[in-house]
Amino acid sequence: MKMTKTYLLVAIALLFTSTSFAELSIKSDVIYGHKDGMALVYSVLQPENANGAAIVFMVSGGWFSRWSPAQRYASRFDDMLDAGFTVIPVHHGSAPRYRVPEAYADVSRAIRHIKLHAGQHGIDPDRIGVTGGSAGGHLSLMLGMDSDAGINGDRDEVMRNSNDVAAIVAYFPPVDLREITGPNDRFPALDFEPAKAAAISPILHADPTDPPILLIHGDADELVEISNSVDMQAEFEKQHITSEFVTIPGAGHGFRGEDATQAAAMRLDWFKRYLL
Protein backbone atom coordinates (compact mmCIF):
# COMPACT_ATOMS: atom_id res chain seq x y z
CA MET A 1 0.00 0.00 0.00
CA LYS A 2 2.82 2.39 0.84
CA MET A 3 4.49 1.74 -2.52
CA THR A 4 1.20 2.30 -4.37
CA LYS A 5 0.77 5.69 -2.70
CA THR A 6 4.32 6.66 -3.64
CA TYR A 7 3.78 5.84 -7.31
CA LEU A 8 0.50 7.74 -7.26
CA LEU A 9 2.18 10.84 -5.86
CA VAL A 10 4.95 10.64 -8.45
CA ALA A 11 2.39 10.29 -11.24
CA ILE A 12 0.46 13.31 -9.99
CA ALA A 13 3.67 15.35 -9.74
CA LEU A 14 4.60 14.45 -13.31
CA LEU A 15 1.13 15.38 -14.50
CA PHE A 16 1.35 18.83 -12.96
CA THR A 17 4.92 19.27 -14.22
CA SER A 18 3.86 18.49 -17.78
CA THR A 19 0.90 20.84 -17.50
CA SER A 20 3.01 23.67 -16.08
CA PHE A 21 5.54 23.49 -18.91
CA ALA A 22 3.06 22.83 -21.74
CA GLU A 23 3.36 26.39 -23.08
CA LEU A 24 7.08 26.73 -22.40
CA SER A 25 9.83 25.98 -24.90
CA ILE A 26 13.06 24.80 -23.27
CA LYS A 27 16.48 24.42 -24.88
CA SER A 28 18.69 22.69 -22.35
CA ASP A 29 22.46 22.87 -22.09
CA VAL A 30 23.30 25.05 -25.08
CA ILE A 31 27.09 24.90 -25.35
CA TYR A 32 28.74 28.33 -25.46
CA GLY A 33 32.34 27.21 -25.02
CA HIS A 34 34.70 24.60 -23.63
CA LYS A 35 37.21 24.63 -20.81
CA ASP A 36 39.67 21.87 -19.95
CA GLY A 37 37.64 19.49 -22.12
CA MET A 38 34.36 20.39 -20.39
CA ALA A 39 31.37 22.16 -21.92
CA LEU A 40 30.17 25.55 -20.68
CA VAL A 41 26.39 25.75 -20.98
CA TYR A 42 23.28 27.86 -20.65
CA SER A 43 19.62 26.99 -21.15
CA VAL A 44 16.87 28.97 -22.86
CA LEU A 45 13.35 29.03 -21.41
CA GLN A 46 10.90 30.81 -23.69
CA PRO A 47 7.20 31.33 -22.96
CA GLU A 48 4.53 31.13 -25.64
CA ASN A 49 3.89 34.86 -25.23
CA ALA A 50 7.57 35.81 -25.67
CA ASN A 51 8.08 39.59 -25.92
CA GLY A 52 11.52 39.44 -27.55
CA ALA A 53 13.46 40.53 -24.46
CA ALA A 54 15.65 38.16 -22.45
CA ILE A 55 16.78 38.02 -18.84
CA VAL A 56 20.06 36.21 -18.23
CA PHE A 57 20.45 34.73 -14.76
CA MET A 58 23.90 34.18 -13.28
CA VAL A 59 23.89 30.70 -11.72
CA SER A 60 26.49 31.56 -9.12
CA GLY A 61 26.67 31.51 -5.33
CA GLY A 62 30.11 32.03 -3.86
CA TRP A 63 31.19 31.63 -7.50
CA PHE A 64 30.09 28.00 -7.30
CA SER A 65 27.94 27.30 -10.35
CA ARG A 66 26.02 24.11 -9.73
CA TRP A 67 24.12 22.53 -12.59
CA SER A 68 20.36 21.97 -12.28
CA PRO A 69 17.79 20.79 -14.84
CA ALA A 70 16.50 23.74 -16.85
CA GLN A 71 12.92 22.95 -15.82
CA ARG A 72 13.66 24.01 -12.25
CA TYR A 73 14.10 27.60 -13.36
CA ALA A 74 10.57 27.62 -14.80
CA SER A 75 9.04 27.78 -11.33
CA ARG A 76 11.77 29.99 -9.89
CA PHE A 77 11.23 32.64 -12.56
CA ASP A 78 7.57 32.11 -13.35
CA ASP A 79 6.91 35.85 -12.91
CA MET A 80 9.37 36.72 -15.68
CA LEU A 81 8.09 33.98 -17.96
CA ASP A 82 4.48 35.00 -17.37
CA ALA A 83 5.45 38.55 -18.38
CA GLY A 84 6.81 37.23 -21.69
CA PHE A 85 10.53 37.37 -20.93
CA THR A 86 12.81 34.63 -22.21
CA VAL A 87 14.91 33.41 -19.25
CA ILE A 88 18.47 32.20 -19.79
CA PRO A 89 20.31 30.67 -16.79
CA VAL A 90 24.08 30.66 -17.43
CA HIS A 91 26.58 28.31 -15.78
CA HIS A 92 30.25 29.26 -15.52
CA GLY A 93 33.33 27.24 -14.65
CA SER A 94 32.76 26.58 -10.96
CA ALA A 95 34.73 26.87 -7.76
CA PRO A 96 36.68 25.22 -6.29
CA ARG A 97 38.49 24.51 -9.55
CA TYR A 98 38.08 27.94 -11.14
CA ARG A 99 38.64 31.42 -9.74
CA VAL A 100 36.61 34.62 -10.06
CA PRO A 101 38.48 36.04 -13.08
CA GLU A 102 37.76 32.82 -14.96
CA ALA A 103 34.10 32.86 -13.94
CA TYR A 104 33.74 36.39 -15.27
CA ALA A 105 35.47 35.47 -18.54
CA ASP A 106 32.98 32.62 -18.93
CA VAL A 107 29.81 34.66 -18.41
CA SER A 108 31.16 37.41 -20.63
CA ARG A 109 31.60 34.84 -23.38
CA ALA A 110 28.09 33.53 -22.70
CA ILE A 111 26.58 36.96 -23.40
CA ARG A 112 28.50 37.16 -26.68
CA HIS A 113 27.27 33.69 -27.65
CA ILE A 114 23.67 34.55 -26.77
CA LYS A 115 23.87 37.67 -28.95
CA LEU A 116 25.43 35.75 -31.83
CA HIS A 117 22.54 33.28 -31.74
CA ALA A 118 19.81 35.74 -30.74
CA GLY A 119 17.81 34.99 -33.89
CA GLN A 120 17.76 31.28 -33.12
CA HIS A 121 16.64 32.02 -29.57
CA GLY A 122 13.90 34.40 -30.69
CA ILE A 123 15.26 37.40 -28.79
CA ASP A 124 16.42 40.93 -29.54
CA PRO A 125 20.19 41.18 -28.87
CA ASP A 126 19.71 44.79 -27.79
CA ARG A 127 17.14 43.90 -25.10
CA ILE A 128 19.06 41.58 -22.81
CA GLY A 129 19.04 42.12 -19.05
CA VAL A 130 21.10 40.29 -16.47
CA THR A 131 20.50 39.43 -12.83
CA GLY A 132 21.97 37.45 -9.97
CA GLY A 133 22.54 37.44 -6.24
CA SER A 134 25.75 37.66 -4.22
CA ALA A 135 28.49 36.29 -6.52
CA GLY A 136 25.87 36.31 -9.28
CA GLY A 137 25.18 39.95 -8.49
CA HIS A 138 28.89 40.69 -8.74
CA LEU A 139 29.09 39.03 -12.15
CA SER A 140 25.96 40.87 -13.29
CA LEU A 141 27.50 44.22 -12.38
CA MET A 142 30.74 43.37 -14.14
CA LEU A 143 28.85 42.52 -17.31
CA GLY A 144 27.26 45.95 -17.28
CA MET A 145 30.42 47.87 -16.50
CA ASP A 146 33.10 46.06 -18.46
CA SER A 147 31.43 45.62 -21.83
CA ASP A 148 32.79 46.16 -25.32
CA ALA A 149 31.50 46.10 -28.90
CA GLY A 150 33.32 42.88 -29.71
CA ILE A 151 36.93 42.06 -30.48
CA ASN A 152 37.49 42.88 -34.13
CA GLY A 153 39.57 40.37 -36.03
CA ASP A 154 39.37 37.67 -33.37
CA ARG A 155 39.54 34.19 -34.88
CA ASP A 156 36.71 33.10 -32.60
CA GLU A 157 33.37 34.22 -34.07
CA VAL A 158 31.82 34.40 -30.61
CA MET A 159 34.40 36.92 -29.39
CA ARG A 160 33.65 39.27 -32.28
CA ASN A 161 30.23 39.95 -30.74
CA SER A 162 29.38 42.55 -28.11
CA ASN A 163 28.97 41.53 -24.47
CA ASP A 164 26.98 44.58 -23.39
CA VAL A 165 23.61 44.31 -21.62
CA ALA A 166 20.65 46.69 -21.44
CA ALA A 167 19.65 46.49 -17.75
CA ILE A 168 20.88 44.94 -14.49
CA VAL A 169 19.34 43.87 -11.20
CA ALA A 170 21.85 42.78 -8.55
CA TYR A 171 20.98 41.37 -5.14
CA PHE A 172 23.49 41.90 -2.28
CA PRO A 173 26.62 42.00 -4.51
CA PRO A 174 30.24 42.23 -3.33
CA VAL A 175 31.68 45.16 -5.27
CA ASP A 176 35.33 45.50 -4.22
CA LEU A 177 37.26 42.26 -4.46
CA ARG A 178 40.51 43.95 -3.49
CA GLU A 179 39.35 43.68 0.11
CA ILE A 180 38.57 39.96 0.09
CA THR A 181 40.99 38.32 -2.37
CA GLY A 182 43.30 35.63 -0.99
CA PRO A 183 43.23 32.12 0.51
CA ASN A 184 39.69 31.28 1.55
CA ASP A 185 38.42 27.87 2.63
CA ARG A 186 34.76 28.82 2.28
CA PHE A 187 35.08 30.66 -1.04
CA PRO A 188 38.08 29.18 -2.89
CA ALA A 189 37.28 31.18 -6.03
CA LEU A 190 38.71 34.22 -4.21
CA ASP A 191 42.15 32.64 -3.97
CA PHE A 192 43.84 34.34 -6.92
CA GLU A 193 46.56 36.92 -7.46
CA PRO A 194 45.64 40.19 -5.68
CA ALA A 195 46.93 42.14 -8.68
CA LYS A 196 43.93 40.86 -10.67
CA ALA A 197 41.31 42.01 -8.16
CA ALA A 198 40.96 45.58 -9.43
CA ALA A 199 40.06 44.38 -12.92
CA ILE A 200 37.01 42.53 -11.59
CA SER A 201 35.86 44.96 -8.89
CA PRO A 202 32.67 46.71 -10.10
CA ILE A 203 33.26 49.70 -7.81
CA LEU A 204 36.21 50.67 -10.03
CA HIS A 205 34.47 50.37 -13.40
CA ALA A 206 31.36 52.56 -13.27
CA ASP A 207 31.04 55.16 -16.02
CA PRO A 208 28.21 57.14 -17.65
CA THR A 209 27.78 54.57 -20.43
CA ASP A 210 26.62 51.85 -18.01
CA PRO A 211 23.04 50.53 -18.37
CA PRO A 212 20.27 51.14 -15.80
CA ILE A 213 21.06 49.29 -12.57
CA LEU A 214 18.91 48.28 -9.59
CA LEU A 215 20.60 47.22 -6.35
CA ILE A 216 18.61 45.39 -3.65
CA HIS A 217 20.24 44.62 -0.30
CA GLY A 218 19.12 43.63 3.18
CA ASP A 219 20.38 45.74 6.08
CA ALA A 220 20.94 42.63 8.22
CA ASP A 221 23.27 40.96 5.71
CA GLU A 222 26.27 39.66 7.66
CA LEU A 223 28.03 37.96 4.74
CA VAL A 224 28.08 40.76 2.17
CA GLU A 225 27.54 43.91 4.18
CA ILE A 226 25.10 46.51 2.89
CA SER A 227 27.98 48.99 2.67
CA ASN A 228 28.84 47.29 -0.63
CA SER A 229 25.62 48.52 -2.23
CA VAL A 230 25.78 51.88 -0.42
CA ASP A 231 29.23 52.53 -1.87
CA MET A 232 28.23 51.22 -5.30
CA GLN A 233 25.17 53.47 -5.44
CA ALA A 234 27.28 56.47 -4.46
CA GLU A 235 29.55 55.71 -7.39
CA PHE A 236 26.57 55.38 -9.74
CA GLU A 237 25.32 58.78 -8.65
CA LYS A 238 28.78 60.28 -9.09
CA GLN A 239 28.89 58.90 -12.65
CA HIS A 240 25.27 59.96 -13.40
CA ILE A 241 24.19 56.38 -14.10
CA THR A 242 20.47 55.60 -14.08
CA SER A 243 20.14 53.55 -10.90
CA GLU A 244 18.14 52.81 -7.79
CA PHE A 245 19.14 51.27 -4.46
CA VAL A 246 16.53 49.55 -2.32
CA THR A 247 17.15 48.45 1.27
CA ILE A 248 15.01 45.65 2.68
CA PRO A 249 14.84 46.16 6.47
CA GLY A 250 15.81 43.12 8.52
CA ALA A 251 16.73 41.00 5.50
CA GLY A 252 19.88 38.92 5.61
CA HIS A 253 21.91 37.30 2.86
CA GLY A 254 19.51 35.44 0.61
CA PHE A 255 15.96 36.79 0.56
CA ARG A 256 13.17 34.57 1.85
CA GLY A 257 9.41 34.76 2.23
CA GLU A 258 7.97 38.25 1.85
CA ASP A 259 11.45 39.70 1.33
CA ALA A 260 11.96 37.44 -1.70
CA THR A 261 8.51 38.31 -3.06
CA GLN A 262 9.15 42.03 -2.67
CA ALA A 263 12.58 41.84 -4.32
CA ALA A 264 11.26 39.77 -7.24
CA ALA A 265 8.47 42.28 -7.86
CA MET A 266 10.95 45.16 -7.98
CA ARG A 267 13.23 43.17 -10.27
CA LEU A 268 10.43 42.40 -12.70
CA ASP A 269 9.31 46.03 -12.74
CA TRP A 270 12.86 47.16 -13.50
CA PHE A 271 13.18 44.85 -16.48
CA LYS A 272 9.75 45.84 -17.78
CA ARG A 273 10.77 49.47 -17.53
CA TYR A 274 14.08 49.16 -19.36
CA LEU A 275 13.73 46.16 -21.69
CA LEU A 276 10.21 46.68 -23.07
Residue ranges of model-derived segments:
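N-terminal cap/lid segment of alpha/beta-hydrolase-fold proteins
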Residues: 23-50
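Alpha/beta-hydrolase active-site loop
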Residues: 98-119
